[in-house]
């Protein structure tokens, strides 16, 4: 899925507004993340090692899931100009190589000064919740200086 970044005025958001994003977590994504961050933990990149663990196979980095939340917040909802204030992330289950995850974001509160609380829930194809949490963001529209 390609996300097209757009700026949305802060007053155009409503509580209950949702956005859904799907992503295949494949070997290329995991190895790219390992190279980018330097996190080459064997549980992520070594099939032989991972088979000997309780997981029985390689698992994706938790940071990949966090990054997907950031990608959707900044690119789709709320969109271009969104600024993170905080993010609570809970990891509930592993994401394995070639799992497809679905992220659903829901605006749960609109606060003063263009701040929003956004519930984040990520599931894999089985329906199992793998990540959840709450993002607090500054909504788009306030970022640019007035002309």
Predicted regions span which residues?
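Catalytic strand-loop segment that frames the active site of acyl-thioester-processing enzymes
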Residues: 2-60, 141
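Short, intrinsically disordered/low-complexity patches at protein termini
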Residues: 43-44, 55, 83-84, 89-91, ...
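Short, intrinsically disordered, mixed-charge
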Residues: 35-39, 74-78, 125
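HotDog/MaoC-like acyl-thioester-processing domains
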Residues: 1-15, 95-147
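Hydrophobic beta-strand-centered segment that forms part of the acyl-chain substrate-binding groove
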Residues: 51-60, 65-104
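Generic detection of short hydrophobic beta-strand segments and adjacent strand-loop junctions
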Residues: 21-25, 89, 135-137
């Amino acid at each position: 899925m390609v996300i097209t970044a757009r700026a949305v005025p802060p007053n155009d958001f409503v509580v209950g507004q949702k956005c859904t994003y799907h992503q295949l977590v494949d070997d290329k994504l995991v190895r790219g993340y390992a190279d980018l961050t330097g996190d080459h933990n064997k549980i992520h990149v070594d099939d032989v090692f991972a088979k000997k663990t309780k997981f029985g196979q390689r698992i994706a980095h938790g940071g990949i899931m966090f990054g997907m939340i950031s990608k959707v917040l900044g690119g789709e909802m709320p969109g271009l100009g969104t600024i993170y204030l905080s993010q609570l992330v809970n990891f509930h289950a592993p994401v394995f190589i070639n799992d497809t995850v679905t992220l659903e974001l829901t605006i749960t509160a609109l606060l003063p000064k263009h701040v929003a609380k956004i519930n984040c829930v990520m599931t894999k194809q089985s329906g199992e919740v793998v990540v959840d949490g709450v993002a607090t963001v500054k909504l788009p529209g306030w970022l640019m200086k007035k002309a």
